[in-house]
Amino acid sequence: MEFSVKSGSPEKQRSACIVVGVYEPRRLSGIAEQLDKISEGYISNLLRRGDLEGKPGQMLLLHHVPNVLSERVLLVGCGKERELDERQYKQIITKTIKTLNETGSMEAVCFLTELHVKGRDTYWKVREAVETTQNSLYSFDALKSAKGETRRPLRKLVFNVPTRRELTVGERAIEHGMAVSAGMRLCRDVANMPPNICNPAYLASQARQMGENSEELTVTTVGEEQMAKLGMNSYLAVGRGSDNESIMTVMEYKGAVDNTEKPIVLVGKGLTFDSGGISLKPGEGMDEMKYDMGGAAGVIGAMKALCDMKLPINVVAILAGCENMPSSNAYRPGDILTTMSGQTVEVLNTDAEGRLVLCDVLTYVERFDPELVVDTATLTGACVIALGKHASGLFSGHNPLAHELLNAGEQSGDRAWRLPIWDEYQEHLESPFADMTNLGGRPAGAITAACFLSRFTKKYNWAHIDVAGTAWNSGANKGSTGRPVPLLTQFLINRAGVEQGD
């Protein structure tokens, strides 16, 4: 899909189709009023006749509107003007793209970016339109022998902005939106891959491929032999039951003018399949445990967006690749593991494995002398129970970092909700035999998991994002969502100090 931005009057557009909004009840937007005046009341007459109410998502395609150069005009219902918010705007864009494709439009000029969306500027409206369009067109059919013929003739979409001085803002929004969309697409492609293809080595290969196309990015890997030398016994224990080698992929991006600038470190849990190990999961829905690498998929997606935008910032990303399988070599409930930090962990349940991988990685990243560390993981079912599918769980003992991430979530629409990690919750992890257990019980499960991780992050500012409820959808629309790529990327854009809106 090709995107561009322009500033012009609707009646002068020679595009195959122009897209304008109509409010409820049958009220013309400013642009629609211009068209109505030029067409001598043609559009308002249709509305009075009841052809379109203006309810959100309603569509009416007009052909050969009098005195308008464009062949077609698509009227889009936008609901009540004062109630148009981010969620409704995205839904309208999605429905518009679907209608343009279904009606055979090859190109269109979209004036919906001139609508007033509460609290949002031109940059946000254009960028969100790009991301929403790209996400609505995504499909994963690489492994189907007979690929369906989806009708998608739309090739070019032009967004109109009110004034010429906003053209630069619009172009920047398209650039950023395309980068985030590319990152989300990579995240979804990697996460949707079946576990017989997407194993830790596959994750590493995807990162290496990215490194070959970016001068700023260097990719290395740490295998099991090197992990053993480093004392990463907890990480190694989780992967011991699998024939697929555990591989930690290290991606170092150096974009800052000052190469000595401390890096931001992103860590992604990369359990490419989680059977639960000896504490075997129920069979129903176990196929979705290929998505237990959703954290790593989100991190590699954010790195893709970072490379595409060439942000002036230093970032280290760790993809903690591993597979949790039952076998005679697998680790067991009752085992006591000595982590890379020297702290010991009593294993109560082998299905609480993500934290055992992450704790060693959180110790490993100390060598980068990080500015801060953000880990993201499909860590707990408890987070899904607490927050559902809409918000990711955010945990941090550092208020400024937590607020930065929450703001990035609000800006990008990839929202998170902060939960506490008070000292009282640490008591749930006490063990009579080791420094801690790997399971805090059913109450506050997402919180106690974050408390466990916090014990390995004393040397830097840290935040944990639990994406167990947001990284993928189940049911008929099963598949990766591409989250938390928008949140992480927005956080990096803000950190880099890159100009965005007006």
Curated annotation (Swiss-Prot):
Domain of life of the source: Bacteria
Gene Ontology MF terms: manganese ion binding; metalloaminopeptidase activity
Gene Ontology CC terms, in alphabetical order: cytoplasm
Catalytic activity from the UniProt record: Release of an N-terminal amino acid, Xaa-|-Yaa-, in which Xaa is preferably Leu, but may be other amino acids including Pro although not Arg or Lys, and Yaa may be Pro. Amino acid amides and methyl esters are also readily hydrolyzed, but rates on arylamides are exceedingly low; Release of an N-terminal amino acid, preferentially leucine, but not glutamic or aspartic acids
Any GO BP: proteolysis
Binding site for Mn(2+) 1: D274, D351, E353
Keywords of the record: Aminopeptidase, Cytoplasm, Hydrolase, Manganese, Metal-binding, Protease
Record's subcellular location: Cytoplasm
Cofactor note: Binds 2 manganese ions per subunit.
Active site location: K281, R355
Membrane spanning stretches: none
Pfam families: Peptidase_M17, Peptidase_M17_N
Cofactor(s) it depends on: Mn(2+)
NCBIfam families: PRK00913.1-1, PRK00913.1-4
PANTHER family in the record: CYTOSOL AMINOPEPTIDASE, LEUCINE AMINOPEPTIDASE-RELATED
Function according to Swiss-Prot or TrEMBL: Presumably involved in the processing and regular turnover of intracellular proteins. Catalyzes the removal of unsubstituted N-terminal amino acids from various peptides.
HAMAP family per UniProt: Cytosol_peptidase_M17
Name of the protein this chain belongs to: Probable cytosol aminopeptidase
